[in-house]
């Protein structure tokens, strides 16, 4: 998953990097690293990002329980 794809997912949910990281229980440094191309999400993280893209509210609801 490219940095551009990750940025597009975050832009699609209209959240700042800080809010995105907090709401989806991710480290801000991790999200920043992914978006800057310094880190690459592993398979599980890439799948999680795809879930966020497909159904952000579903993921937020699941994390809230």
Regions found by a protein language model. Name each.
Residues 14-32:
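Short alpha-helical DNA-recognition segment
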